[in-house]
Amino acid sequence: RRSSDLEAIRNLAEKPCIILGRCASDILKDRMNVLNIFVCADKEDRIKRIMKLEDLSYEDAKEKIDKTDEQRASYYYEHTGKTWGDVNDYHMILDTSALGVENCPDILMHYFEKLEYI
């Protein structure tokens, strides 16, 4: 990981922001004002969602998800030495299969309002 990436993430985190991926949960692990959230779903739900969004066959969608998951896990491990998706690295996990994709933004907004972040 380049030092410019680390610096960019740390600079962004000086103000309220949302950072997707890039090992930000590990880069910012020592900060008190950070909330690390992992969004996940059952594999079958993910396959169906990708099939619909990208007009793919079941096998092509499954292959795409498998490849993407492998790349994410590899990238995360390479840069942190940790397992991608390990529940111990996150403050909150949102399972869109259980909660519904459409409900997750509302859940987060309610949580942030409760903590008076917004």
Question: Model-predicted segments: where are they?
Answer:
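Short, small-residue-biased leader/transition segments that mark boundaries at the very start
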Residues: 2-3
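Short, amphipathic alpha-helical "lid/cap" segments that border enzyme active or binding sites
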Residues: 6, 101-109
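ATP-dependent NMP and nucleoside kinases share a basic, alpha-helical "lid"
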Residues: 10-54
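Surface-exposed, interaction-prone regions with an acidic/low-complexity signature
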Residues: 26-28, 35, 39, 85, ...
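Short, solvent-exposed amphipathic alpha-helical segments in soluble enzyme
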Residues: 53-55, 109-111
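Arginine/glycine-rich "motif VI" loop of SF2 helicases in the C-terminal RecA-like domain
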Residues: 54-57, 117
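Small-molecule kinase domains that catalyze NTP-dependent phosphoryl transfer to phosphate-bearing small molecules
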Residues: 57-102
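Short, charged, intrinsically disordered terminal tails
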Residues: 110-118
